[in-house]
Amino acid sequence: MGLKDELTTFCHDVFNGNWETTEGKNVPDEDSRLTLKNTAITIDGTVLYADLDGSTAMVDGYKNWFAAEIYKTYLYCCARIIAAEGGVVTAYDGDRVMALFIGERKNTRAARAAMKIKWAVDEIIMPKKDARYTSNKFALKHVTGIDTCSLFVAKTGARGANDLVWVGRAANYAAKLTSLPSTYTYITESVYKMLADEAKTSNGKSMWEKVTWNTFNNSTIYRSNWRWRID
């Protein structure tokens, strides 16, 4: 079969085939029983995106090995904090990481992870960087976005070169939130409504500010510059 015929057959089969969906109990991965045909897993999940801000300027203005050290330390801290809060890293994309939280208190755990990442940047990564490079003025800036919804997970790509696609509002909104100013962590209203009190207030003071997402349908979102100490 020639390449044109192969592509035509595949597209015909996808558009005309029935979907076989199962309800997920665990975070799907590449070993899940998903195929390149119309198979999918549905799962209720909270998506966290953590993204470095200004990475283009960093790679343009600093040595490649220094940029790599920033990537490595930031993404390592993100991954370990996410895991400690019961989340699962589902993808790395250059200078950012996507993670999924499922089960009880998934929104609270995701929000807590975001605040811990902020603390780690300020209290671990930057002090270690400054101690090693005393004349280097680089300041690591980052932003985290979180949303929650029911996700439709399918396998995309071709044999030997494929990945999972997370279809649903949460993956898109969480990623878009990271385009907002890096001073804050951002969550959607859906996430905020599901937060436990411990992730909403501290000593009677709100940890979140209600704002309007002017560049995205004037949606209501919440932002926070609070941090969560890691012991």
UniProtKB/Swiss-Prot annotation:
GO terms for molecular function: lyase activity; metal ion binding; nucleotide binding. Induction: Expression is probably induced by infection with phage T7. It is an enzyme of class 4 (lyase). Keywords: Antiviral defense, Cytoplasm, Lyase, Manganese, Metal-binding, Nucleotide-binding. One of its GO terms (biological process) is defense response to virus. Its EC number is 4.6.1.26. It catalyses: UTP = 3',5'-cyclic UMP + diphosphate. Its cofactor is Mn(2+). GO terms for cellular component: cytoplasm. A ribonucleoside 5'-triphosphate binds at residues 49, 96. It is found in: Cytoplasm. Mn(2+) 2 binds at residues 51, 95. It comes from the Bacteria. Pycsar (pyrimidine cyclase system for antiphage resistance) provides immunity against bacteriophage. The pyrimidine cyclase (PycC) synthesizes cyclic nucleotides in response to infection; these serve as specific second messenger signals. The signal activates the adjacent effector, leading to bacterial cell death and abortive phage infection. A clade B Pycsar system. Homodimer. Belongs to the adenylyl cyclase class-4/guanylyl cyclase family. Pyrimidine cyclase subfamily. This is Uridylate cyclase.
